[in-house]
């Protein structure tokens, strides 16, 4: 006989208030966990937190459930159902069918403990479809599903799940921080109401998860709008300007602290080009997870940003990029100017969409004529790239006496996205994301000699319609007129009689006689 009272299940963290703990029947809850051992411990504590008469089933992915899940003799249900499944995408799709072959899911709590990074290679569309299916199934069968997902790179997935509030009743993550854990609750819906953006410190002692005592009386975090979290390099050696300033030695430590903030100002430092992509990922994570009240700035300490890099940081969620040539006084004024602002621009959930804006052309150097035309045409037709800012097309005709193949040997582009081809006695270059006013500087970096000494004629196109029109003309060139680089010549290297003494090579002297024996006897 089915229960008359609707069951309410609880997450396995002691002293957590009901608004953030209860899971009534008829919904799906999702927990991201950094470590697999924490996922197992949380699942066992959740089992022990249920009533004695509760119906509980645990599904383990890619492991034996009998070895990792256990009943507590002093608390929890009298018995639980154990299931195992393969770490495969198809197993997730057939999960509901397989469960219903064994039990009646009505009023059950199902705990699915995934394998490490199990969802990493599953596309976002299929994840959304699966969540929608599980949501409908749990409501139809009046049961609850708790997904505990361990993985060391869950930020991308967490950002995606933030928008799945129609399919998920709760979304939280448990982050390992050494001596304790940070419980980050994005949203949690139950019979007590809706809670969102909660961050609490929890600890594990003897397999029991508890709320840190200092957190118990504080439900909502205090306002941190006046806080300024900054990389120490931003102030150029100056001490913190007030009690609201907090300095960090590097961007990684700053990022971890910013994940606990709500409306603070975060100022990153950019000192080299290699930091751009990691910094963009950090900014994207903060903006997607911490919301629009946080102010995020990037201080360029050395000249390392191209226009497209700055556009990437702003698209990932930065409020402002402070240029490298701005003095400290100007930098502080710009930090002050963003106070009270709300970030209003849309930030895509998948950062790969934004990263494709910086390097959509993953080619460099010489390309065949048709490959070159197709690559540039794809750039022109990319809707994610800014209009009239995709790059510069340059056609160069060598001076008399220099073949175009010889001029090609002097063309040495260093950036990914800078490509060239030859045909019709012309050397044609496409410099991606190069501004027209920076063209001469770019050419001076590409050619070791002044271009005026190598080429007699230069034509430039920098607007999208101009480049597209020139591509139409380039495609009309017959394949017989397409050029190819000069073949590489390998000169034979003579064998040197030498030995290495541990520091450098030394030639071994060979004795030589100026006169043979016959000449010596005659003398």
Curated annotation (Swiss-Prot):
Changing residue 418 to R: No longer binds c-di-GMP. This is Cyclic di-GMP binding protein BcsE. The keyword DNA damage does not apply. Residues 153-492 are annotated as: GIL domain, sufficient for c-di-GMP binding. The central domain (GIL, residues 153-492) is sufficient for c-di-GMP binding. Changing residue 415 to D: No longer binds c-di-GMP, does not complement a bcsE deletion in S.typhimurium 14028. Belongs to the BcsE family. It comes from Escherichia coli (strain K12). Keywords: Cellulose biosynthesis, Nucleotide-binding. One of its GO terms (biological process) is cellulose biosynthetic process. Cellulose production is abolished in E.coli K12 / MG1655 and W3110 due to a premature stop codon in bcsQ. The lineage of its organism: Bacteria, Pseudomonadati, Pseudomonadota, Gammaproteobacteria, Enterobacterales. Binds bis-(3'-5') cyclic diguanylic acid (c-di-GMP), the ability to bind c-di-GMP is important for its function. Disruption phenotype: When the bcsEFG operon is disrupted in a cellulose-synthesizing strain (a strain K12 / W3110 derivative called AR3110 with a restored, functional bcsQ gene), cellulose is no longer made. The gene is bcsE. GO terms for molecular function: cyclic-di-GMP binding. It comes from the Bacteria. Changing residue 287 to D: Wild-type c-di-GMP binding.
